[in-house]
Amino acid sequence: MLSILKKLFGTANDRTVKKLFSEITKINSLEPVIQKLSDEELKNKTVEFKEKLKNGATLDDILYEAFAVVRESARRVCGMRHFDVQLIGGLILHQGMITEMRTGEGKTLVATLPAYLNALTGKGVHVVTVNDYLASRDSASMGKIYNFLGLSVGCIVAGMSDEAKRAAYNADITHATNNELGFDYLRDNMKYSIQERVLRPFNFAIIDEVDSILIDEARTPLVISGPVNDNSELYTKIDKIVRQLKAGDFEKDEKLKTIHLTELGITHIESLLSNENIIKPDSGLYDFENLTLVHYINQALRAHNMFNVDVDYLVRDGQVMIIDEFTGRVMEGRRYSEGLHQALEAKENVKIQNENQTLASITFQNYFRNYPKLSGMTGTAMTEAPELKDIYNLDVVAVPTHNKVTRVDLDDEIYGSKKEKYDAILKLIKDCYNRGQPILVGTISIEKSEELSSVLNKEKIPHKILNAKFHEQEAFIIAQAGRFRAVTIATNMAGRGTDIMLGGNPEMLIEQLAKDHSYEAKIAEIKAQIAEEKKKVIEAGGLFVIGTERHESRRIDNQLRGRSGRQGDPGKTQFFLSLDDDLMRIFASERISGVLRTLGLKDGEAIHHPMISRSLEKAQQKVEGHNYEIRKNLLRFDDVMNDQRKIIYEQRTEIIKSKDSYDFLNSTTAELAKKIVLTFMPAGSYREDWDIENLSVELHRIFSIKFDHNLVSKNDVTEEEITKSVIQMAHDIYKSKEESYSSELMHNAVKYILLTTLDQVWKDHLYSLDHLRQGISLRAYAQQDPLSEYKREAFNLFEQMLDNLKELFIQTVYHFHIDLKHVQKEDVSLEHKKFQKNMQESREDPAFSKYNAGSSLEIDLKPVVSRIDPKDRNPEDPTSWGRVSRNELCPCRSGKKYKYCHGANA
């Protein structure tokens, strides 16, 4: 019934596209008029549009004419004219939606339409790509159009100076990678002046490969970190012990990706730990003093049994480097958190880098939701449309192709074993190679791609291998995958964003010759050669894409298929599967193997059966649903931190912008003075209950006040009068500092102290939230909702953080001393710039350089003294306590607050 209705009325997508086609006629009707304009008149249209906007017109009022102007400019400058379907894509992007356009349909050119239109407001447009190569390529090629129309273009890549970045972000249109944008946002919110920041306020972003950025990478936060204590020796010892465990000592579940020790394993490992003198002979692994070892053992177990070299990570130049499971690319600088990366380093016997504490972090989910207007484009988004709508409020519209798709997608071939599957793939590759048909073979890991490469080498079939180990050559290799007799092996979607043209990509071949002085004479020769090869390739059947396994996500499979058949080109795709494949082995029904044998599957024979195809699709849907729930759950928890992050960042910006910090200083002084007095002189209490001795100690600790006991000798004195006296004494101390150092210097010092204190308590708060998050799921066993509990406790921690901020800020202001001999006007700024220079960012836990500050306003940037989980603190060993909040109960279990016990002299 539903299919009949769809045929009668069309899908919602069909109706949207039909409506947009009616909009295109209005743009097309302007084309003859725009074509008659001279270059100068065409350029002046930008000035005219800006003037209209200044006088109250909206972007929609000038949309049709602006699109027509961009189309004509692209034709004159680049020799490319936007097709009608590309205009539709531009309209979808301008309306803040995601456009799904097949590979080769010219998404890069589509982005010029909404980018130009929205840049006319002067608020900036960000065009976001997945790597530096694409950002540089697109800004250079499309920048010609923008420059022709009088708009400025910037490009952000890794390694640029702040000055260069600031100029690029101030351009009308900025091309940048998602990683650099996120890190620049975090870095900006760690700077000490508005002038040092590089980003402008958020306006409009167009995300290329939007599914990769908003879905595949959504679970990995951007993190700026600093080191905690060095435990490399312990990681090495634990690794040595875990290597001695045998089958039966632990159980693992590949489906749920979990691993744990059995009772037998616990007994065995306790014996090994005792032999290495890591635990006492008479103690157990789960005794209180040994609980921290459980974490190290679990991570070592995961490293040895759940993570494989050349599949999940590479070892290069003495470093463990993570491989992106979706793209097969090395994720430069990214490190696994919670000690897993250190466990992998111990496993691979490379230098173990320190664990790190989070200083700042954000997920792409929350970063991109900062933009008032967001849009994106990709070749595969429909399968993820519900998630994109639910999380980002982005609708997906599939745009029809300019030319009809002639690619043939063949049925999957299923074999009993991996060897039989590879034999069939090899047979097909040989056949295609002999006929000259180019082949692109997609694998799911570096290990599999190198395995297949060795098979082809034995058969003496020349080929190119494209994986994370050779990512520098990625774009060039993939661009030439359509040449006559080309055989290319690629991990998943390596090279995404680069078109595979039948016969080869002439532009990239010409680029390779650019260093040769005689290259111009060879251009015509190259173009003629490519044209000849294209004819041969089309006769051979176009690009044949072979999938060696099904991915967990249907979308990744569709992306691989989409490499063939661009712009109406012929082509074929086919997946080869075996019962040994991970998806079949872990997720598909166990009945499949029996069914295949029943159907008479013989060695070397393939089988096609609808039930198997359905089972595979259900397995993929199950995994996709599971991953979606993980991302959605991550967002629910991250939203709690995001709300707090917004408050802190807004407060930090206000502090930086403020010309006077005295209001906050005075109000906080009064608040703390009242709080301290009432703590030791409770309202309504008798004089004999007043603790004047400890009141004096606390006032000196916080305000550096020498309290006069005679103030309380009067019989009729009240706590209000004492509070007023304390506030006045604090005010006098501050005034004396002002007289000694100057008002301007004190103002700068107070602002700097406030910012550094805010950064310190926020850093500690992030650490507390990390620990809270790690164990919060266990609340479910107590019939409590983990999310509700996390929200409640995170709020309490946030309030405690604000209390700590006030106390530390006031304490520092009233106690600090400046050595005027060494103070320069720019000292504060210079110290912070040095700090920023030594700071590193990554997708997870980068190293953080030690830094010793100069002699003015001493800044202690030693490795972070981190907060320790209370259950891991030894009451008799203060060195095991880590950082303790002054308002916490003292870990020695005296029952007193830390600030009145062991922290009294801290």
UniProtKB/Swiss-Prot annotation:
<dbReference type="Pfam" id="PF21090">
    <property type="entry name" value="P-loop_SecA"/>
</dbReference>
<dbReference type="Pfam" id="PF07517">
    <property type="entry name" value="SecA_DEAD"/>
</dbReference>
<dbReference type="InterPro" id="IPR014018">
    <property type="entry name" value="SecA_motor_DEAD"/>
</dbReference>
<dbReference type="InterPro" id="IPR044722">
    <property type="entry name" value="SecA_SF2_C"/>
</dbReference>
<keyword id="KW-0813">Transport</keyword>
<dbReference type="InterPro" id="IPR011116">
    <property type="entry name" value="SecA_Wing/Scaffold"/>
</dbReference>
<dbReference type="InterPro" id="IPR001650">
    <property type="entry name" value="Helicase_C-like"/>
</dbReference>
<dbReference type="InterPro" id="IPR036266">
    <property type="entry name" value="SecA_Wing/Scaffold_sf"/>
</dbReference>
<keyword id="KW-0653">Protein transport</keyword>
<dbReference type="GO" id="GO:0065002">
    <property type="term" value="P:intracellular protein transmembrane transport"/>
</dbReference>
<feature type="binding site">
    <location>
        <position position="499"/>
    </location>
    <ligand>
        <name>ATP</name>
    </ligand>
</feature>
<keyword id="KW-0067">ATP-binding</keyword>
<keyword id="KW-0862">Zinc</keyword>
<protein>
    <recommendedName>
        <fullName>Protein translocase subunit SecA</fullName>
        <ecNumber>7.4.2.8</ecNumber>
    </recommendedName>
</protein>
<dbReference type="GO" id="GO:0017038">
    <property type="term" value="P:protein import"/>
</dbReference>
<feature type="binding site">
    <location>
        <position position="890"/>
    </location>
    <ligand>
        <name>Zn(2+)</name>
    </ligand>
</feature>
<keyword id="KW-0472">Membrane</keyword>
<keyword id="KW-1278">Translocase</keyword>
<dbReference type="GO" id="GO:0046872">
    <property type="term" value="F:metal ion binding"/>
</dbReference>
<keyword id="KW-0811">Translocation</keyword>
<dbReference type="GO" id="GO:0005886">
    <property type="term" value="C:plasma membrane"/>
</dbReference>
<dbReference type="InterPro" id="IPR011115">
    <property type="entry name" value="SecA_DEAD"/>
</dbReference>
<dbReference type="InterPro" id="IPR027417">
    <property type="entry name" value="P-loop_NTPase"/>
</dbReference>
<dbReference type="InterPro" id="IPR004027">
    <property type="entry name" value="SEC_C_motif"/>
</dbReference>
<keyword id="KW-0963">Cytoplasm</keyword>
<dbReference type="Pfam" id="PF07516">
    <property type="entry name" value="SecA_SW"/>
</dbReference>
<feature type="binding site">
    <location>
        <position position="901"/>
    </location>
    <ligand>
        <name>Zn(2+)</name>
    </ligand>
</feature>
<comment type="subunit">
    <text>Monomer and homodimer. Part of the essential Sec protein translocation apparatus which comprises SecA, SecYEG and auxiliary proteins SecDF-YajC and YidC.</text>
</comment>
<dbReference type="Pfam" id="PF02810">
    <property type="entry name" value="SEC-C"/>
</dbReference>
<dbReference type="InterPro" id="IPR000185">
    <property type="entry name" value="SecA"/>
</dbReference>
<keyword id="KW-1003">Cell membrane</keyword>
<feature type="binding site">
    <location>
        <position position="86"/>
    </location>
    <ligand>
        <name>ATP</name>
    </ligand>
</feature>
<dbReference type="GO" id="GO:0031522">
    <property type="term" value="C:cell envelope Sec protein transport complex"/>
</dbReference>
<dbReference type="InterPro" id="IPR011130">
    <property type="entry name" value="SecA_preprotein_X-link_dom"/>
</dbReference>
<dbReference type="GO" id="GO:0006605">
    <property type="term" value="P:protein targeting"/>
</dbReference>
<feature type="region of interest" description="Disordered">
    <location>
        <begin position="865"/>
        <end position="885"/>
    </location>
</feature>
<dbReference type="GO" id="GO:0043952">
    <property type="term" value="P:protein transport by the Sec complex"/>
</dbReference>
<comment type="function">
    <text>Part of the Sec protein translocase complex. Interacts with the SecYEG preprotein conducting channel. Has a central role in coupling the hydrolysis of ATP to the transfer of proteins into and across the cell membrane, serving both as a receptor for the preprotein-SecB complex and as an ATP-driven molecular motor driving the stepwise translocation of polypeptide chains across the membrane.</text>
</comment>
<comment type="similarity">
    <text>Belongs to the SecA family.</text>
</comment>
<keyword id="KW-0479">Metal-binding</keyword>
<feature type="binding site">
    <location>
        <position position="902"/>
    </location>
    <ligand>
        <name>Zn(2+)</name>
    </ligand>
</feature>
<feature type="binding site">
    <location>
        <begin position="104"/>
        <end position="108"/>
    </location>
    <ligand>
        <name>ATP</name>
    </ligand>
</feature>
